[in-house]
Amino acid sequence: MPKLRSATSTQGRNMAGARALWRATGMKENDFGKPIIAVVNSFTQFVPGHVHLKDMGQLVAAEIEKAGGVAKEFNTIAVDDGIAMGHGGMLYSLPSRDLIADSVEYMVNAHCADAMVCISNCDKITPGMLMAAMRLNIPTIFVSGGPMEAGKTKLSDQLIRLDLVDAMIEAADPNVSDERIDAIERSACPTCGSCSGMFTANSMNCLTEALGLSLPGNGSMLATHADRKELFLKAGRQIVELCKRYYEQDDASVLPRSIGTFDAFENAMSLDIAMGGSSNTVLHLLAAAQEAGVDFKMEDIDRLSRKVPCLSKIAPNTNKYHMEDVHRAGGIMGLLGELDRAGLIHKNTHTVLGMSMGEQLDQYDIIRNQDEELHKFFRAGPAGIRTTQAFSQDCRWDTVDNDRVNGCIRNKENAISQEGGLAVLFGNLAEDGCIVKTAGVDESIWKFTGTAIVFESQEDAVAGILGGKVKEGHVVVIRYEGPKGGPGMQEMLYPTSYLKSMGLGKKCALLTDGRFSGGTSGLSIGHASPEAASGGAIGLVRDGDIINIDIPNRAINLEISNDELAARRAEQDQKGWQPANREREVSFALKVFGHFATSADKGAVRDKTLLK
């Protein structure tokens, strides 16, 4: 029978000093011997997705204590990618993921916690906590802060729905008036919560459902809705139940590595492909799989992308649907239900509810279960009131959206496309693969041949786009922005947004060893591996080279001979794999990250071989 980890510091005569300190935190005599559960919060006033989380930790903690556990809360950092975007702050975003994972490990192991409830929400916080959960392998439940309501404003006598990407695109368009930009800016982000589309934050919170590590509704229930409170309360109760099952009944099926199996990672990736999620999820799932000891690779993602259809098109891929609409259509359980009916998920995986995924779908899929309370749960909708308060409204749609022909979530027969919303491309420009979010690419440019225009940094690319250097037919190559080369693997939301602002959204492609925001759409290909700083062929491209992109055949190639490629490689080996004439101040902390970072095909995790 597994022994409580916390017994190390709560039991035995020689732990009198530790117990004295525990007592100073409020523990009583009868608390020693109960599971100590870490409530891992991420409240900050810097991030709208986390600004409402201040009281959530104590909400969960109170429920844990009612159920027979001892709750101890601590906080992690949280970076807002949207605020950090477009300047040097973005260099810190991806490294913060690993810092979060490490800090959770440090706190939990230093204090011998028995279990965790992870209260996350935004882009790198959920992945960082997920990596920590897989690394620590103690009972864990995720509960996120929830999505923001979609922005809405009236322009030209027409009500339109918005998100932060609309503000960025319009602001860079010289033909748009200041008054229009001001109206969009003030309306784009109306409430607390993670940005309202299927961007990275919401994609990752949805994937925790598919992995089985969070409760149904976690990825889609609005941050402002009163029903979300029950997810926090239930997480507090359920984590104590998981502790009992593991520590008292020796049931290891409740542990993260038992839940996060290869099949569970396939389920999560299949969901991501079906919903056209952020390409960043590829990076984070690969990293989490490595922490879990699961051999899940780019080749597996490529295989899944060829058979899983795209069943939903959500902002930023359309302005018709946002996360509030996904929830109305049955949320992630609705999407997984359609994948199940298509024979495309594994139903035997475990979940934190103690059920198999198949059993959970029987209970929570609105198509197969007509229970009135279930449908009421998925009718939870927006209030349209600006607020930073969680659980502040109880508005509901009149009906759920169960239209699987033309609705927000489609069935396989009526799929938006029979191939999924993400694709892996291979070729001499990316021997280890690169990623494109096909759900955001107009089918007219799924095959694209263009002329390379090369930039050694995101900043130079932005200047080139806004300065008119980038023309129709160009493939914009932004290199030395990978995990090692940046360092930090910046997101390229500004370059892709500015291409749209300049009327080039369907007339150009963009290739980078950096990554993209979940808000990116267009022919934007990222994660080119190996990256330039690791000797990848993207570092050998020259202005005027012809690049051929073929999404249907999953290919991306530089149209030069093998002899020419080899000659360029030999020349670059002599020069060194570093950007030419780039001025960038890089802190010691970022240099450490870059020194250990692997390329994106490995999840940009640390290269452990460097420690041997």
Swiss-Prot record:
GO terms for cellular component: cytosol. InterPro entries: Dihydro-acid_dehy_C (IPR042096), DihydroxyA_deHydtase (IPR004404), DiOHA_6PGluconate_deHydtase_CS (IPR020558), ILV_EDD_C (IPR056740), ILV_EDD_N (IPR000581), IlvD/EDD_N (IPR037237). Its cofactor is [2Fe-2S] cluster; Mg(2+). The keyword Iron applies. It catalyses: (2R)-2,3-dihydroxy-3-methylbutanoate = 3-methyl-2-oxobutanoate + H2O; (2R,3R)-2,3-dihydroxy-3-methylpentanoate = (S)-3-methyl-2-oxopentanoate + H2O. Pfam families: ILV_EDD_C, ILVD_EDD_N. Keywords: 2Fe-2S, Amino-acid biosynthesis, Branched-chain amino acid biosynthesis, Iron, Iron-sulfur, Lyase, Magnesium, Metal-binding. It comes from the Bacteria. PROSITE patterns: ILVD_EDD_1 (PS00886), ILVD_EDD_2 (PS00887). Its EC number is 4.2.1.9. One of its GO terms (molecular function) is dihydroxy-acid dehydratase activity. The keyword DNA damage does not apply. The modification N6-carboxylysine is found at residue 124. Binds 1 [2Fe-2S] cluster per subunit. This cluster acts as a Lewis acid cofactor. The active site is at residue 517. Pathway: Amino-acid biosynthesis; L-isoleucine biosynthesis; L-isoleucine from 2-oxobutanoate: step 3/4; Amino-acid biosynthesis; L-valine biosynthesis; L-valine from pyruvate: step 3/4. [2Fe-2S] cluster binds at residues 122, 195. Mg(2+) binds at residues 81, 123-124, 491. SUPFAM superfamilies: IlvD/EDD N-terminal domain-like, LeuD/IlvD-like. GO terms for biological process: isoleucine biosynthetic process; L-valine biosynthetic process. Functions in the biosynthesis of branched-chain amino acids. Catalyzes the dehydration of (2R,3R)-2,3-dihydroxy-3-methylpentanoate (2,3-dihydroxy-3-methylvalerate) into 2-oxo-3-methylpentanoate (2-oxo-3-methylvalerate) and of (2R)-2,3-dihydroxy-3-methylbutanoate (2,3-dihydroxyisovalerate) into 2-oxo-3-methylbutanoate (2-oxoisovalerate), the penultimate precursor to L-isoleucine and L-valine, respectively. Homodimer. HAMAP family: IlvD. Belongs to the IlvD/Edd family. This is Dihydroxy-acid dehydratase. It comes from Haemophilus influenzae (strain 86-028NP).
